[in-house]
């Protein structure tokens, strides 16, 4: 301590007791200064020695107490009591009658109201202080170094004294246990074994780590904390030699693995893509590359699946996936734009590894992921037809796999746009479906084969993919290669040039049945693989058919069918062969479990009538094919095998069609029964009488109502129209009880039948006017019906 530290109003006062014999302070040479309460303050020598001359009379204890009180009021009153030479080896004692403890910046200080003397240490206990006039005061010195404890003395009431413990050195140890949050939510503790703490002269604490651990500390002035990004665990990433490219000047790379990843991003492995890993609302974007012949590289990323997003990093044939999701670069982006940077770079040298912990300063904010890309020869892509031998030769090329996700209203499309840079950096951002309907890709010059896979969802949720591979691309200008994908379910690849490949949707799978392609009259000649029907050839049979305005033709030619189908659609979209329109007659009852995307071949009927080959072996074209129920005691006859199978489900009690209306849950054996039941919930009456404004929910009710009009007019009439049944169609269903057509005219292309009055009602409901005649004649069907 210096004198300036104790230049205050009240300083520490130490009274040096004097003795004559010289043996009164022999025991005061301990490690610390002994603090005790003084018993004598006379001007002469101590009365305990008994040997000196010139002694004054010893005051009484009451006088001593009065003198002590007077020293508190007047500090210079008893300055003459410290006269006389002090003996060498005398013990320094502190008068703690009115002592106060004060905590300063450098420790505890003992403050007394007396200023006659100062505290002395044990090294200066033999030196005398000449205080004849009482005005001198020695320098303030610190007590010898040691740990101080607070000890309570019995003589001092409610006061505490700092007592120095001799022989104890200050040694402070700290144990630093950092806690990190792992990906699965558990706490991970790293114990710093054998860590020692040292304090240098500048007051900074240095932590010496144990074996195999590194703890970053701050040696500068001030206790700054390392500003790390939230929810990030910084790790060192081993890097290997990459392909045949040349790295830039940087030699240190860092990866930041996020614990929580915002946004709906799913990385799919290209070798195990199945329908289970794809959902209609998922956004898939995967880029894999195969370049050098190095193998055995491991994925360097790992993530955890959370409720709002999932990050799946997998390895396809020892090839790694690398993304940078939702990181904020130097450019200004909005909240709904997730920038994804894909970087591929490498060197032609041997596989060298380096571990750094350098922090990337350009990244700010959470949910960032920067990972460099290793290129291996084992990265095979699904749908790729390239052999392994070709992959080993094309070391400088890349395979780009683009999987456009199935989007719904309000969701975003992922647009990949490649900039012509040396490192082949791909940047993508989320664009709304309303602003961008297509997916455009600009390939880089000398790039590898590009594989485009378009998803298609069937009626039962099964996902099928269409693969398009483009090879040997030589891009001269940045806008030469443009690939446009339309986000439609029913997609067909058209014949276009090599520079522009366009996928054009032909029809939507929701509006047409499976296996049926709806085209206009102008598209019949341009579409390959479709059979066209020359309606003028039907003039030999005395029938003339004209296409109605605004009514396209629906042509279905499926392998296994016995005849082509020709249908006329009305303006309201309610076709003649629609399942909901004519389902009650049982003409279009589909199988209980239809296959998605394809139609199965018709199964051979096992009824007794077909087994005897009497029905199918008959050469009579006017005879209908019949199918008889083999259940004993039933014997019902049907014209279609699907009707017979639906009837057999009625026998077995199987009801695969269930109503999904709230609190209903009824099940039915046929789909037309389910459609008819749903109209009871909605109250829809789609069958209208052509002669009166009455409407009905069921077609059989309408047919009964039409009979009332026919009875008033004097008999039923017969009309001729174009039916939608194939050549093997026959009678109605079991429940309708309608009569079979009275006449059937068969041609090689279509089936013309004379229908019953309820068929007339169906045609009238669909917007087609049919003229009724009493006998079979040539009829011109036009827009106005006449």
UniProtKB/Swiss-Prot annotation:
Biased composition (Low complexity): 36-48, 73-86, 125-137, 343-358, 372-397
A Pfam family per the record: zf-C2H2
Matching InterPro entries: Znf_C2H2_sf, Znf_C2H2_type
Processing and modification events after translation: Phosphorylated on multiple serine and threonine residues. Phosphorylation is coupled to ubiquitination, sumoylation and proteolytic processing. Phosphorylation on Ser-60 enhances proteolytic cleavage. Phosphorylation on Ser-7 enhances ubiquitination and protein degradation. Hyperphosphorylation on Ser-102 in response to DNA damage has no effect on transcriptional activity. MAPK1/MAPK3-mediated phosphorylation on Thr-454 and Thr-740 enhances VEGF transcription but, represses FGF2-triggered PDGFR-alpha transcription. Also implicated in the repression of RECK by ERBB2.
PROSITE patterns, per the entry: ZINC_FINGER_C2H2_1 (PS00028), ZINC_FINGER_C2H2_2 (PS50157)
Sequence segments annotated as region (VZV IE62-binding): 620-786
Tissue: Expressed in all tissues tested, including lung, kidney, spleen and thymus.
Region feature (Domain D): 709-786
Region Repressor domain: start-end pairs: 2-83
UniProt keyword list: Acetylation, Activator, Biological rhythms, Cytoplasm, DNA-binding, Glycoprotein, Isopeptide bond, Metal-binding, Nucleus, Phosphoprotein, Repeat, Repressor, Transcription, Transcription regulation, Ubl conjugation, Zinc, Zinc-finger
GO molecular function, one term: histone deacetylase binding
Sequence positions bearing Phosphoserine: 2, 7, 60, 102, 613, 642, 671, 699, 703
GO cellular component, one term: cytoplasm
Zinc finger (C2H2-type): 627-656, 657-686, 687-714
Phosphothreonine found at: 279, 454, 641, 652, 669, 682, 740
Extent of Gly residues compositional bias: 19-33
Location in or out of the cell: Nucleus; Cytoplasm
Family listed: Belongs to the Sp1 C2H2-type zinc-finger protein family.
Domain notes: The 9aaTAD motif is a transactivation domain present in a large number of yeast and animal transcription factors.
Entry protein name: Transcription factor Sp1
Organism: Rattus norvegicus (Rat)
């Amino acid at each position: 301590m210096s004198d300036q530290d104790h230049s205050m109003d009240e300083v520490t006062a130490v009274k040096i007791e004097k003795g004559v014999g010289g043996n009164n302070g022999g025991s005061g040479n301990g490690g610390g200064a002994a603090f005790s309460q003084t018993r004598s303050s006379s001007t002469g020598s101590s009365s305990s020695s008994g040997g000196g001359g010139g002694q004054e009379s010893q005051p009484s204890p009451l006088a001593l107490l009065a003198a002590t009180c007077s020293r508190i009021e007047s500090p210079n009153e008893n300055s003459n009591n410290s006269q006389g030479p002090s003996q060498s080896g005398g013990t320094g004692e502190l008068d703690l009658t009115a002592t106060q403890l004060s905590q300063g910046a450098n420790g505890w200080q003992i403050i007394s109201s007396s200023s006659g003397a100062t505290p002395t240490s044990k090294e200066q206990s033999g030196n005398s202080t000449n205080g004849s006039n009482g005005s001198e005061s020695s320098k303030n010195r610190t007590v010898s170094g040691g740990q101080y404890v607070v000890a309570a003395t019995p003589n001092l009431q409610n006061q505490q004294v700092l007592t120095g413990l001799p022989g104890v050195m200050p040694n402070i140890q700290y144990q630093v246990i950092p806690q990190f949050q792992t990906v699965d939510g558990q706490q991970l503790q790293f114990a710093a074994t054998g860590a020692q703490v040292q304090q240098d002269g500048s007051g900074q604490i240095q932590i010496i780590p144990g074996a195999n651990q590194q703890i970053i500390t701050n040696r500068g002035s001030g206790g700054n904390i390392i500003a790390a990004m939230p929810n990030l665990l910084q790790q060192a990433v081993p890097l290997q030699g990459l392909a045949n490219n040349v790295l830039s000047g940087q030699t240190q790379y860092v990866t930041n693995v996020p614990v929580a990843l915002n946004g709906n991003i799913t990385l799919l492995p290209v070798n195990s893509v199945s329908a289970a890993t794809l959902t209609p609302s998922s956004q898939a974007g995967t880029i894999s590359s195969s370049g050098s012949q190095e193998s055995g590289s491991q994925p360097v990323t790992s993530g955890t699946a959370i409720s709002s997003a999932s990050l799946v990093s997998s390895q396809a044939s020892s090839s790694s996936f690398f993304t940078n999701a939702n990181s904020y670069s130097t450019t200004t982006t909005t909240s709904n734009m997730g920038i994804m940077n894909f970087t591929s770079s490498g060197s032609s040298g041997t596989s060298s590894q380096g571990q750094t912990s350098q922090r990337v300063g350009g990244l700010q904010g959470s949910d960032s992921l920067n990972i460099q890309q290793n290129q291996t020869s084992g990265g095979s892509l699904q749908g790729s037809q390239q052999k392994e031998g070709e992959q080993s030769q094309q070391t400088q090329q890349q395979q780009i796999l683009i999987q456009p996700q199935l989007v719904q209203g309000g969701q975003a499309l992922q647009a990949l746009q490649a900039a012509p840079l040396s490192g082949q950096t791909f940047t993508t951002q989320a664009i709304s479906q309303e602003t961008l309907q297509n997916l455009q890709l600009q390939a880089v010059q000398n790039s590898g084969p590009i594989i485009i896979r378009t998803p298609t969802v069937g009626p039962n949720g099964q996902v099928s993919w269409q693969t398009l591979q483009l090879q040997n691309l030589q891009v001269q200008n940045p806008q030469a290669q443009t690939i446009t994908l339309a986000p439609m379910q029913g997609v067909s690849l058209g014949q276009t040039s090599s520079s522009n490949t366009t996928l054009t949707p032909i029809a939507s799978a929701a509006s047409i049945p499976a296996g049926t392609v709806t085209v206009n009259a102008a598209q019949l000649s341009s579409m390959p693989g479709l059979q066209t029907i020359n309606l003028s050839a039907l003039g030999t049979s005395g029938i003339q058919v004209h296409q109605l305005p605004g009514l396209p033709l629906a042509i279905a030619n499926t392998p296994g069918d016995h005849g082509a189908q020709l249908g006329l659609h009305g303006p309201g979209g309610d076709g003649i062969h629609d399942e909901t329109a004519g389902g009650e007659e049982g003409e279009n009852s589909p199988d209980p479990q239809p296959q998605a995307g394809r139609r199965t071949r018709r199964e051979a009927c096992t009824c007794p009538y077909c087994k005897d080959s009497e029905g199918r072996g008959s050469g009579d074209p006017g005879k209908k094919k019949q199918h008889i129920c083999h259940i004993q005691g039933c014997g019902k006859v049907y014209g279609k095998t699907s009707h017979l199978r639906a009837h057999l489900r009625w026998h077995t009690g199987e009801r695969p069609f269930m109503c999904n209306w709230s609190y209903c849950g009824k099940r039915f054996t046929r789909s037309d029964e389910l459609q008819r039941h749903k109209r009871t919930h909605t109250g829809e009456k789609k069958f209208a009488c052509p002669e009166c404004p009455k409407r009905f929910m069921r077609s059989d009710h309408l047919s009964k109502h039409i009979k009332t009009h026919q009875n008033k007019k004097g008999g039923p009439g017969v009309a001729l129209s174009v039916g939608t049944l194939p050549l093997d169609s026959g009678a109605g269903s079991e429940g309708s009880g309608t009569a079979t057509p009275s006449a059937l005219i068969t041609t090689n292309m279509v089936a013309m039948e004379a229908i019953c009055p309820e068929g007339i009602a169906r045609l009238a409901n669909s917007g087609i006017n049919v003229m009724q005649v009493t006998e079979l004649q040539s009829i011109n069907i036009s827009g106005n019906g006449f």
